[in-house]
UniProtKB/Swiss-Prot annotation:
Interacts with AIM2; this interaction promotes AIM2 stability. Interacts with SCNA; this interaction causes DDX10 mislocalization to the nucleoplasm and cytoplasmic inclusions. Putative ATP-dependent RNA helicase that plays various role in innate immunity or inflammation. Plays a role in the enhancement of AIM2-induced inflammasome activation by interacting with AIM2 and stabilizing its protein level. Negatively regulates viral infection by promoting interferon beta production and interferon stimulated genes/ISGs expression. Pfam families: CTE_SPB4, DEAD, Helicase_C. Residues 577-593, 772-790 have a biased composition (Acidic residues). Signal peptide: none annotated. This is Probable ATP-dependent RNA helicase DDX10. Its main location: cytoplasm. The gene is DDX10. ATP binds at Y89, R90, L91, Q96, A113, K114, T115, G116, S117, G118, K119, T120. It catalyses: ATP + H2O = ADP + phosphate + H(+). The keyword Phosphoprotein applies. High in testis but widely expressed. It comes from Homo sapiens. GO terms for biological process: anterior head development; rRNA processing. There is a cross-link at K649 (Glycyl lysine isopeptide (Lys-Gly) (interchain with G-Cter in SUMO2)).
Length: 875
């Protein structure tokens, strides 16, 4: 076999393309083998993620708080760090530095720090990392529960969570009041992180069947001291009962609770207490300047208006104690127009309106927000310059949270507290809480009085006047219900002056205030009576009894002049009835003591003249004079010690056996009372109106009177007898049907009369028109030569045609009368007049087209004149 041309022995060069293709094929085969080997050696993503999680968990114990300055110094997942960087969170605060590491290790944490120190991120970062470690998905259900006291704070927390955790695959939801419950119930099962308020959460636990929290991993209470307060106590107890005990719990607040009872409710296990600023000099931010002023209650509105006028380019929050105050003052200040935008935020607003106000105040650079304490906790409003506390807070903790809305995270801010002269004790409480407040004075030259303007506004607007009255009552009630009576004393408030400052002419009536004012006098009377009635010895002589009687009469007359009423009077107020019953029980006890003492053979020391007392008791009270009755009551009200040590249980049982007067009286039902009033035949006032023509205008339809007299009018039994009512209705139905038949007959008769009258009128009109009807024919202008008019001598002899026209004229008259009746007195046309001629008796069968016309040799006008002449001659 010979050698080829491309063989090496032939001396020819090898083909480079062929050799390159051969090399490329070998190289690609080698690379594919390497890729397959690399794929076999490569781990799946879930396994790599688990290994990274295990490495992070190993680094949790190595966290050194002193070395941490950034979030990247913590062993956090890449998704969390990326979310923090995108949200511009890089440096950590003190509370974040000390609590995030403990929370990552799975410990229960109680964190407390100043307002604006970053507590929200301190619990959101551990929340994201806890679910990331467990590889939590939407199908796993609820994993973390974050509870906030207010809707606005929950909304703010949810927005921060969206920014920080947007790179994770968790689902988060906001459950607050004011939203659609069904819409929330449809999506609540797929939520991993739930931010909510206590009330709506409990509602879903009770009403949403598929909602459960059995797999809950972490519970977070934001503003924990407020949530664990008495206001949320019942709700939180019910919520905690539905949560598993094996969970991690985080509590954060600016004023943290240390109550063992509250912490025991949450089932905390070895919690870590983190009080960042516990050893600090002040409990408020160092950049916050705090002052207070003292002014009278009637000057507070003028002070507020003057403050707003002098801070037009500032962003301020004004706190009030009640919603109705915010509602009234917001509307009034909008009418006063201080020169700055005013917003209102309170609990009585709809949820969507509250969100709009919150977002609008965040956007504005210069505005004033009138708010209640729902905005006092947790809300982070940017660049707030002033916090003005119009009403004194209930305690120092509330003041700290209110003032914390400004000076957020190393920014400057100012806080002003307005106190009444009776509320100066609050300053000492603030100093005890390490709150540095200084007193400043009001410049009277810059104070603008707005009382006259308010009076004029209320005089024009009735709705605003009613709001002012509700504002007045609401403020007085809030002061009255405050727990700290050393600071809040409603009796020291200048009530009439405060009403005038609101623009009201007269102070509204406050019922609870009137009752409160009566209580001191009763206590004084009771104390004086106790002092007077104290016995001097266990046994008394007759002379001593007489002296005591005169002394009692004198004292009781003085007390009665001061407002005390006698025992015999009825229908007292609630507080008076309690005192009266107590005094009557004491009298009965004394009488029982005397009877028991007689039974034992000993004489009662309180009544030496028992025969006289017995005679007095036997006389009916209605026959006694007023003086004797008072004297008897005064004497029997002598309070004695239980000398014999008798048991009072027997006395109370005897008192219970005696029937009271109220139980003896027969109860009067509403039906009996109504019948009793009807029997008296009271004449009710009636308003009678007339039209311009003098006709009576009936405002109400007449009441249908029963045709059957009720046989049991005097029956006082309550309720309705259905059987008798059914029989009564059946009898009434017969009369109703008869009345209906009469009405229908009268209606038909009236209709017939109207139709008959109409026919008569029509006949009269027809007869009148027939009498007045007259035909006018124009003269012909054909003969121009005859200027003198028509010549009667040219007419033919009328006697020639008289005999033949006698019968036809009668038929013609009948036809004309019939056509007039049918066509409404319409004039005949010229064609009908032309067709008049000798015809047969049967006009219907006659054929008009076969008849030959009568040729008189005259013109048309002359023929018409002839016909008219003939008709007149017949008549």
């Amino acid at each position: 076999m010979g050698k080829t041309a491309n063989s090496p022995g032939s001396g020819a060069r090898p083909d480079p393309v062929r050799s390159f293709n051969r090399w490329k094929k070998k190289h690609s085969h080698r690379q594919n083998k390497k890729k397959q080997l690399r794929k076999q050696l490569k781990k799946p993503e879930w396994q790599v993620e688990r290994e990274s999680i295990s490495r992070l968990m190993q680094n949790y114990e190595k966290i050194n708080v002193n070395e941490i300055t950034r979030f990247s110094d913590f062993p956090l997942s890449k998704k969390t760090l990326k979310g923090l960087q995108e949200a511009q969170y890089r440096l950590v605060t003190e509370i974040q530095k000390q609590t995030i590491g403990l929370a990552l290790q799975g410990k229960d944490v109680l964190g407390a720090a100043k307002t604006g120190s970053g507590k929200t991120l301190a619990f959101l970062v551990p929340v994201l990392e806890a679910l990331y470690r467990l590889q939590w998905t939407s199908t796993d259900g609820l994993g973390v529960l974050i509870i906030s006291p207010t809707r606005e704070l929950a909304y703010q927390t949810f927005e921060v969570l969206r920014k920080v955790g947007k790179n994770h695959d968790f689902s988060a939801g906001l459950i607050i009041g004011g939203k659609d419950l069904k819409h929330e119930a449809e999506r609540i099962n797929n939520i991993n992180i739930l931010v909510c308020t206590p009330g709506r959460l409990l509602q879903h636990m009770d009403e949403t069947v598929s909602f459960h929290a059995t797999d809950l991993q972490m519970l977070v209470l934001d503003e924990a001291d407020r949530i664990l307060d008495m206001g949320f106590a019942d709700t939180m107890n019910a919520v905690i009962e539905n949560l598993p005990k094996k969970r991690q719990t985080l509590l954060f607040s600016a004023t943290q609770t240390k109550s063992v009872k509250d912490l025991a409710r949450l089932s905390l296990k070895n919690p870590e207490y983190v009080w960042v600023h516990e050893k600090a000099k002040y409990s408020t931010p160092a950049t916050l300047e705090q002052n207070y002023i003292v002014c009278e209650l009637q000057q507070k509105i003028s002070v507020l208006y003057s403050f707003l006028r002098s801070h037009l380019k500032k962003k301020s929050i004004v706190f009030f104690s009640s919603c109705k105050e915010v509602q009234y003052l917001y509307r009034v200040f909008c009418r006063l127009r201080p020169g700055v935008s005013i917003l209102a935020l309170h609990g009585r607003q709809q949820q969507m309106r509250r969100m709009e106000v919150y977002n609008e105040f965040v956007r504005k650079r210069a505005a004033v927000l009138f708010a209640t304490d729902i905005a006092a906790r947790g809300l982070d409003f940017p660049a707030v310059n002033w916090v003005l506390q119009f009403d004194c807070p209930e305690d120092a903790n509330t003041y700290i949270h209110r003032a914390g809305r400004t000076a957020r995270y190393k920014e400057d801010g100012e806080a002003l507290l307005i106190l009444l002269p009776s509320e100066k004790a609050m300053v000492q409480q603030l100093l005890q809480k390490k709150v540095p407040v200084k007193e400043i004075k009001i410049n009277p030259e810059k104070l603008i009085d707005v009382q006259k303007k308010l009076e004029s506004i209320l005089a024009q607007d009735q709705d605003l006047k009613e709001r002012a009255q509700r504002c007045f009552v609401s403020y007085v009630r809030s002061v009255y219900l405050m727990k700290d009576k050393e600071v809040f004393d409603v009796s020291k408030l200048p009530i009439p002056e405060y009403a005038l400052s609101l623009g009201l002419a007269v102070a509204p009536r406050v019922r609870f205030l009137q009752k409160m004012q009566k209580q001191p006098t009763k206590e004084l009377v009771r104390s004086q009576a106790d002092k007077v009635i104290e016995p001097r010895a266990p046994s008394l002589t007759n002379d001593e009894v007489e002296e005591f009687r005169a002394y009692f009469n004198e004292k009781m007359s003085i007390l009665q002049k001061g407002g005390k009423r006698l025992e015999g009077t009825e229908h007292r107020q609630d507080n008076d009835t309690g005192n009266e019953e107590q005094e009557e029980e004491e009298d009965d006890e004394e009488e029982m003591e005397e009877k028991l003492a007689k039974a034992k053979g000993s004489q009662a020391p309180s009544l030496p003249n028992t025969s006289e007392a017995q005679k007095i008791k036997e006389v009916p009270t209605q026959f006694l004079d007023r003086d004797e009755e008072e004297e008897d009551a005064d004497f029997l009200k002598v309070k004695r010690h239980n000398v014999f040590g008798l048991d009072l249980k027997d006395e109370k049982t005897l008192q219970k056996k005696e029937p009271s007067k109220s139980s003896i009286k027969k109860k009067m039902t509403k039906v009996a009372e109504a019948k009793k009033v009807m029997k008296r035949n009271f004449k009710v006032n009636k308003k009678i109106t007339f039209t311009d023509e003098g006709e009576l205008v009936q405002q109400w339809p007449q009441m249908q009177k029963s045709a059957i007299k009720d046989a049991e009018e005097d029956d006082d039994t309550g309720g309705i007898n259905l059987h008798k009512a059914k029989e009564r209705l059946q009898e009434e139905d017969k009369f109703d049907k008869e009345e209906y038949r009469k009405k229908i007959k009268a209606k038909h008769r009236e209709k017939r009369l109207k139709e008959r009258e109409a026919r008569r009128e029509a006949n009269k009109r027809q007869a009148k028109a027939k009498d007045e009807e007259e035909a006018f024919l124009d003269w012909s202008d054909d003969d121009d030569d005859d200027d003198d008019g028509f010549d009667p001598s040219t007419l033919p002899d009328p006697d020639k045609y008289r005999s033949s026209e006698d019968s036809d004229s009668e038929d013609m008259e009948n036809k004309i009368s019939d056509t007039k009746k049918k066509q409404g007195m319409k004039k005949r046309s010229n064609s009908e007049v032309e067709d008049v001629g000798p015809t047969s008796h049967n006009r219907k069968k006659a054929r008009w087209d076969t008849l030959e016309p009568l040729d008189t040799g005259l013109s048309l006008a002359e023929d018409e004149e002839l016909v008219l002449h003939l008709l007149r001659s017949q008549s």
